[in-house]
């Protein structure tokens, strides 16, 4: 060590033995300079501060006599020498030699006896009139008047919020001493340091140094030991009286009193309905942490996230943040961890993480919804309205609520033809085509439980999708009374069987029956149910008359509808 007048007592017995057994006497007659000699062996490029009288320093040294014989070394003790400068705790020459040094500077110092231990020396250790040479490396410097030093080297353009007392933060850091020696790093553990600020969970200097930081900000916080681990250090990696330097990157910030934050990005001009508790939503989202790290995205799966809201199917913050949205709206929802995944996190979401969801609402509905019909045009004569059993020809465009086109008969160049009320379209469409006249144009909105349900149509219609149909009715053929597939337009001949049985053999075959029915339809005397396969209707009619199933109908088997209610017959 660089000996103080009283510090010599701390020398170890080992060093004393080395001196007694191995140290040669000083060379007599050698001219000794009375001046302090300082050679700056290495000076760092950056030197923000130099030693002044009154500063506290920590340094390594090797002490030798002029002949090169070592008499002491801090390296041998694996500990720096720590002392105030200019307060008489050092020999005068060392007190002077340390002034003006930078951290990481190396000096060769030659101290004459008059600035060291003089003509008396130290009995048994330092001979009288000894010139002492010290190889000094300064590793730390601070002053009792120092405060926490903050140097911000990156600050994001947007800083809507800064750290306040009682906030909870997540940050990465590298912890070094003033000489750059690393003593700890959250990066090495691949885990942020998570803590409250300003309530005593941190060393005082860090509590102060974090205040005012923005998420995304990077700063260097330099802390004197009396605001860090003091004289004792931490008992492990940090020695006593060490100044600490923390290179901090703030990733996350919230307060336990925080609620969700909602920022509307795009709100459609027309918003006829806003989501309520109990509604079922389909939406896309990107989920990120506050520092922008992506943890999930519905877009990457090419599938919306579909859920009920207000019923606990999603985290509380999203349950709240999805209320009051419009179809087509884009909004940002910021969710504090106590309304997200809490202290434990989930999957790639770390514990105590604030979550940011950028959402796009595709559609929503309520299980109690029915279809919605908006008529855009009706012709002057709109007296004949569609009903169950009518045969309809119409054009349509089918889309999702966000405007995504699913299908169009106009693009196909042909109409869509159905018999109303016979399950040939989804229930919502069947309902939406009722009481419509030829030439009318209307928009029908169909909730999924009246459309294609949760399953949708693979590759065509997403599951749980609300559908929008823009319809134009082009043709309407009135159907038959319910339960009939064929009716007479006039009186039925009393000799009907004989008219069908042209060969008069008392038996009617399918060919005879079919020829006769088609002839009646062609002449306008009879009518088949429109929209169905005529041959199948005729065959079913014949089968119903063929009671014994022998492929022919006799006069005894032949009956009209009103004569036999169990069969759909003539």
Swiss-Prot record:
Signal sequence interval, chain numbering: 1-24
Annotated glycosylation sites: 174, 286, 302, 397
Modification comment? Phosphorylated.
Q: InterPro entries of this UniProt entry? A: EF-hand-dom_pair, EF_Hand_1_Ca_BS, EF_hand_dom, FKBP-like_isomerase, PPIase_dom_sf, PPIase_FKBP_dom
Please, which domain of life does this record's source organism belong to?
A: Eukaryota
One GO location term (cellular component)? endoplasmic reticulum
Activity regulation as described: Inhibited by FK506.
The protein's annotated catalytic reaction(s) are: [protein]-peptidylproline (omega=180) = [protein]-peptidylproline (omega=0)
CDD domains the UniProt entry points to:
EFh
Q: Which SUPFAM superfamilies has this protein been placed in?
A: EF-hand, FKBP-like
UniProt main location, coarse: endoplasmic reticulum
What positions does the record give for the motif labelled Prevents secretion from ER?
Answer: 567-570
What are the alphabetically sorted keywords of the record?
Calcium, Endoplasmic reticulum, Glycoprotein, Isomerase, Metal-binding, Repeat, Rotamase, Signal
Q: Where is the EF-hand domain?
A: 488-523, 533-568
* Gene3D superfamilies, A to Z: 3.10.50.40, EF-hand (1.10.238.10)
- What EC identifiers does the entry list? 5.2.1.8
Binding sites annotated in the UniProt record for Ca(2+) 1: 501, 503, 505, 507, 512
Q: Which residues bind Ca(2+) 2?
A: 546, 548, 550, 552, 557
Pfam families (UniProt xref): EF-hand_5, FKBP_C
Q: Where in the cell is it found?
A: Endoplasmic reticulum lumen
Question: What GO molecular function annotations does the UniProt record carry, in alphabetical order?
Answer: calcium ion binding; peptidyl-prolyl cis-trans isomerase activity
Span of domain PPIase FKBP-type: 54-142, 166-254, 278-365, 389-477
Give GO terms for biological process.
protein folding
Give the protein's function.
PPIases accelerate the folding of proteins during protein synthesis.
The name under which this protein is listed is Peptidyl-prolyl cis-trans isomerase FKBP9
